[in-house]
């Protein structure tokens, strides 16, 4: 969705940059095209009124012809619409049993509360290891 809008705005920006304010192309060589002469499209010729247009004649849509005069018999309204304003066809539906006992007592015994959690006993940690005292070494011999 965002990409399509971004692409559309980019194409619009390119189209606006290609035309100047007066509607003529910005490029100077647009009046004298340096390439070969390209004839106008046939679609543009007959779209401006050059009838008959090329190709076989396309008849008007049949949907447009019979949309005003529907060829099929009249479709009756839905039965849902008929009984939605009054009583529905068929026997009445009793209320749900859940609604019946939800206002009174439930049909089963109450659920007992969960037992309290018993915590594990506190573990005593091992005593902290005491390090051996720092050993004193003999002084280093000095060269004489």
UniProtKB/Swiss-Prot annotation:
GO terms for cellular component: cytosol; extracellular region. It is found in: Secreted; Cytoplasm, Cytosol. The keyword Cytoplasm applies. The modification Pyrrolidone carboxylic acid is found at residues 31, 48, 68, 85, 103, 117, 123. Expressed by venom gland. Residues 81-110 are annotated as: Disordered. This is Bradykinin-potentiating and C-type natriuretic peptides isoform 2. Changing residue 75 to A: Low decrease in ability to enhance AsS activity. Changing residue 77 to A: Important decrease in ability to enhance AsS activity. The keyword Secreted applies. Residues 24-30, 41-47, 61-67, 78-84, 96-102, 114-116, 122, 128-144 form a propeptide. GO terms for molecular function: peptidase inhibitor activity; toxin activity. One of its GO terms (biological process) is blood vessel diameter maintenance. Changing residue 73 to A: Low decrease in ability to enhance AsS activity. In the N-terminal section; belongs to the bradykinin-potentiating peptide family. It comes from Bothrops jararacussu. Keywords: Cytoplasm, Hypotensive agent, Metalloenzyme inhibitor, Metalloprotease inhibitor, Protease inhibitor, Pyrrolidone carboxylic acid, Secreted, Signal, Toxin, Vasoactive. Residues 1-23 form the signal peptide.
